[in-house]
Curated annotation (Swiss-Prot):
Names of required cofactors: Mg(2+)
Entry EC number(s): 2.7.4.-
Similarity annotation: Belongs to the polyphosphate kinase 2 (PPK2) family. Class I subfamily.
pH-activity relationship: Optimum pH is 8.
A Pfam entry, by short name: PPK2
Function text: Uses inorganic polyphosphate (polyP) as a donor to convert NDP to NTP. PolyP hydrolysis is slightly faster with UDP, but it can also use ADP, GDP and CDP.
Protein name: NDP-polyphosphate phosphotransferase 3
């Protein structure tokens, strides 16, 4: 039994139950969320506070992405030549687009120098270790770019929401996380922390799409399903985590990802504009879209 009184651990379920998203949509989803999804066209933005009414056009997206991926190739060449170490942490709401954003970063990079770290639940041995220990072994070596698809921030959010850690463990995490990250930065690691945030209606629409698409059903995890009723608990945990782990030396970059195309471009621009690498085309890099990209103050806008 976890601290919330439940004996069920969604991490131990063998797969996402067929039809669970549809049942939630029909029987339990808030009426305004359900109506927004039912009335919308495919490219409509569902959030009423998002600064754009529709997704970026595919033509504009492709043109900008191609230019940015050329810059990423330059960045990787500089990382390899200079021995730099770069670590990118991707956190966010479920279905916010973390994996897709990482994919666009790596699309034209040499995979030998651009690793993805996506850890499963900790083993018994790992649970007995210092919490950060299993993440440390995956930090970048000289010449490497490492993408964490979820990271040590599991403790601040999902572990807390599902009762997989107690309050003492979580408080210890918050006491240690900023000194830990400052040590990484002081040692020369370029550290970028991304929080991708998506509105409730858009999240449910993406879950529903995954459930109906045989090629995407693997993306729908038991934790996603179990979390459908925990939106408010997630909101509180996210707010606490961003507030307590943001600093000038290891800041959070929050990206509103209701439009995946704009979110991917903003994330890539954040990294490219944050590192001085050789032969940078500053006009091509530009600046992240401030309407959807900023600090913790915009996360729940």
């Amino acid at each position: 039994m976890n601290r919330n009184g439940s004996t069920k651990d969604p991490r131990r379920m063998t797969g996402a139950a067929t039809g669970e998203i549809s049942r939630y949509f029909n029987d339990k989803a808030p009426k305004d969320i359900r109506r927004a999804i039912e009335k919308a066209d495919k490219d409509d933005i569902l959030s009423t506070t998002y600064p754009y009414d529709a997704e970026m056009t595919a033509k504009d997206y492709r043109a900008q992405m191609e230019a940015l991926q050329i810059e990423l190739v330059k960045l990787q060449a500089w990382i390899k030549q200079s021995g730099a170490r770069v670590a990118l942490l991707f956190e966010g709401r479920d279905a916010a687009g973390k994996g897709g954003t990482i994919k666009r970063f790596r699309e034209n990079l040499n995979p030998r120098g651009a690793r993805v770290v996506a850890l499963s639940k900790p083993t018994e041995a790992e649970r007995s270790q210092w919490y950060f220990q299993r993440y440390i072994q995956h930090l970048p070596s000289a010449g490497e770019l490492v993408f964490y698809d979820r990271s040590w921030y599991n403790r601040g959010v999902v572990e807390h929401v599902f009762g997989w850690c107690d309050e003492e463990q979580r408080e210890r995490f918050f006491r240690q996380v900023m000194p830990f990250e400052h040590d990484l930065v002081d040692d020369g690691i370029h550290l970028f922390k991304f929080w991708l945030n998506v509105g409730r209606a858009e999240q449910l629409r993406r879950f529903h799409d995954r459930e109906r698409d045989p090629l995407k059903q693997w993306k729908l995890s038991p934790v996603d399903i179990a979390g459908l009723d925990k939106w408010e608990a997630y909101t509180t945990a996210i707010s606490q985590t961003l507030t307590r782990s943001h600093s000038d030396r290891a800041p959070w970059t929050v990206i509103r990802s209701d439009d995946k195309k704009r979110a991917r471009l903003a994330a890539i621009r954040t990294v490219l504009s944050g590192i001085d690498y050789d032969n940078k085309d500053r006009a091509a890099v530009g600046q992240p879209d401030a309407a959807i990209c900023g600090g913790p103050d915009i996360w729940d806008a």
